[in-house]
Amino acid sequence: MSNESKCPFSGHNSKPQVTVGGGTANLHWWPNQLRVDLLNQHSERSNPLGKDFNYRQEFKKLDYYALKADIKNVLTDSQDWWPADWGNYTGLFIRLAWHAAGTYRMGDGRGGAGRGQQRFAPLNSWPDNASLDKARRLLWPVKQKYGQKISWADLFILAGNIALESSGFRTFGFGAGREDVWEPDNDVNWGDEKEWLAHRNSEALAGSNLAATEMGLIYVNPEGPQASGDPRSAAPFIRATFGNMAMDDEEIVALIAGGHTLGKTHGAASADHVQADPEGAPIEQMGFGWANSYGTGVGKDAITSGLEVIWSQTPTQWSNYFFENLFKYEWVQERSPAGAIQWVAADAEAIIPDPFDPSIKRKPTMLTTDLTLRFDPEFEKISRRFLNDPQAFANAFARAWFKLTHRDMGPKARYLGPEVPAEDLIWQDPLPAASATPSSASIADAKAKIVALGLSTGELVSLAWASASTFRGGDKRGGANGARIALSPQREWEVNKKAVETLTKIEELKASTQLSLADLIVLAGNVGVEQAAQAAGFNITVPFAPGRVDALQSQTDVESFQLLLGLADGFRNWKKQGVNTPAEVLLIDKAQQLTLTAPELTALIGGLRVLGTNWDGSQHGVFTQQVGVLSTDFFTNLLDMSNVWAPVDSTSEVFEGKDRKSGTVKFTATRNDLVFGSNSILRALAEVYAQADGKEKFVQDFVAAWTKVMNLDRFDLA
C-alpha cells in the first residue's frame, strides 16, 4: 500500500482531515460575537427522553427506601479498581455531593447540583473534582437499576446524604426533583482565567458571580491563598467564596468541620504521576481520568488533591473529633508525600487509623484552611462553641448541609419524596398555602374591573412583566407568584417606578375580588395583551392559570431578593448605571435566565416595544405610530432600508434613526433594539415577523412566550 492510499484513521497520514465541527470557529474571527446560541441549549434534540417525559411522575413510581438501601450497600462494597478507604466510600460520596452542589452562586443563581452538570465538562475535569469520576462510576449500577425514576442530579446528593446517615449522623432531610440535562451548561461563566488554579483576590470575589478562589476549585485552596500555608490570610477568601453561596460564619464553620469529620484526602506521591483528566484522557480510559502511575495507582497509592490528611480517629463515623483535635494539639507545618503544605499535630500520639493497614497509626493532620477555624477570631468563637456543644454543631451542620445541597432548587414546591422537611426556611422563598381556586365567573369579574380602571395597555403589561420577569432559571427563584413586587426590595427598585404606580391601582381592586394580588397582576397583563391584539385585528384569549398567592414581607429575605434585580432588563430597556457590559450581552443573559429561546426573545422584544413598556416611558425602540397595538411595526421599521442609524454620543448606547434621504429623525433606539437588525441570527428571526404573512404568527408567538414567562414559577402546574 502506498503512502497516499493509507487509511486516514491509521495515524500514518499527516494530512489534516476535514471533520465535522472542525476548522477555525466563528469565535476565533469574532471573539465578541453575541452568544445567541446560549438560548438554544438543552433543546429536545439533545434530550433522549423526549418532550413528554415527566421526571416528577417517574420519581413517584420509585421505591425510595429500596433505592436508599442499595446506595448504602455500595458504600461498603469496595471495588478493586478503586478500593474504599477503611472499606467504606462514605468520605468519597460526601465529597461527590458537596462538589456537585458547591458550584452554586447566589449572584446569578447559576451552578449547583440541580442539573447533574458534574457529568460534563468542565466540571467533570476540574482539578478539584479529581477522582469523583470513580464515585460516579460506583453509582452506575444503582442508576442502571432504577433508570429514569432517579436522576443523576438527585442521585449525587442522595448518595451524600446516605453516606452521612451511615456514619451515624442525622440529616435534616432530602428533597428530590433535580432534573438531568444532557449537555454542558455553557451559559455559566466560570471565570476568564486560561490556566487551571489561576488565583483570584478576595476583593474581586466578594459580591461577584464566581464561587471559587482559583479556576477549577470548588471553594478555596486548602493550602491557603496561593498555597501560602497561612491560615489567617485564608479567612477573607473563605468568607468571600462561601458568602457567594449565601453562607454566614456559623454555616461556614459547620460545613468545613462537618465535611472534614469523615474521610480523608489523597496525596501518596507527586502529581507528576497523574495523567490527563477525564475530558482529555485517551479513549480507552472510557471516561475515567487522572490515571496514576505511582505504585498500584489506587488505594494507599492514590493521588487526588496531593494532600494526605485524616482529621478524625473515626473517619467513617460521625464524631466531634475535628474540633477536639483542632484545639487540643499544637500544629506544625509539614509537606505531604506529594509536596503539598499541610499540618500535623506535633504533640499527639499516633491515634489515626491507616485506611488500608490496621496495624499502622498516624498522627492527626489538618489542612491550612482547617486551622483558619481556630486562628481567625470570629471563626474561633464559633468553633469553640461547637467544641463544647457537639449537638449544636450537629444541628448547624445538618441545616447548612441541607442548604448547601438544596439552595439551587428554588421553592419547596419543587421538592419530591418522603423526607422533605416540614419546616419552611427563609432561603426557600416560602409562600402561604393556596386557598380555593377562583371560579371562572370571579375571573371574568376581575377582568372587567381591571378594564374599568382605564389603564393603558403599556401600563398593564409593564406591571405584569415587572412582577414575572424576576424569575431565574438557574435557581428557580423569582417570578410572579408571591406578588413580591409589592414588597421590599422590589417595590423600591428604580426600574419598577412606573410599574408600582400601576400596582397601587391594582391593589385597590384586591378587596373586591376573589383573586390574590399576584393573580390580579398577571391577569392585568393578560388584559393588556388581549386589548393590544384586538387593536391589531386579532381576537385572542391569553391563557390564565389562577392559583398564585401573596407572600408576606416576613417571608422575603430582602438582601437575597435584591440580587434578582440583576444588571439590566433589556426587555424594558433598563440598564444599571455604571455597568459597562454591552446591553445586548445582558439581554441574552436575561433571556437565558427566563429560559427563553431566541425566537421567544425576538417575539417578546418586538411586542413589548410597540406596547410602550420601557421602564422610564422613553420612546427608545418604540418603532410605531400605534403604541398599544400588537403590531409587527418594530420589525418592519427596524429592517426598513430607508432608515439609517447613528449613535447620539461616544457611548454608543442610544441611537437615532433618520430618514436616509431627508435626514429627519424618525426613531431612537438602544443596543437592545438594534441588535435585532445587526446580529445575523436575530435579524433572521426578525425577518420572519416583518414579512407580509408574519402578523398573525407574531401575535400567536408573542402570546405563547408571554404566557410562558407569566407561568415560569408555577411549579404546581407541572
UniProtKB/Swiss-Prot annotation:
Gene3D superfamilies: 1.10.520.10, Peroxidase, domain 2. Keywords: Heme, Hydrogen peroxide, Iron, Metal-binding, Oxidoreductase, Peroxidase. There is a cross-link at Y219-M245 (Tryptophyl-tyrosyl-methioninium (Tyr-Met) (with W-98)). This is Catalase-peroxidase. Bifunctional enzyme with both catalase and broad-spectrum peroxidase activity. SUPFAM superfamilies: Heme-dependent peroxidases. HAMAP family: Catal_peroxid. Heme b binds at H260. The active site is at H99. There is a cross-link at W98-Y219 (Tryptophyl-tyrosyl-methioninium (Trp-Tyr) (with M-245)). Belongs to the peroxidase family. Peroxidase/catalase subfamily. The gene is katG. GO terms for molecular function: catalase activity; heme binding; metal ion binding. Its EC number is 1.11.1.21. The keyword Iron applies.
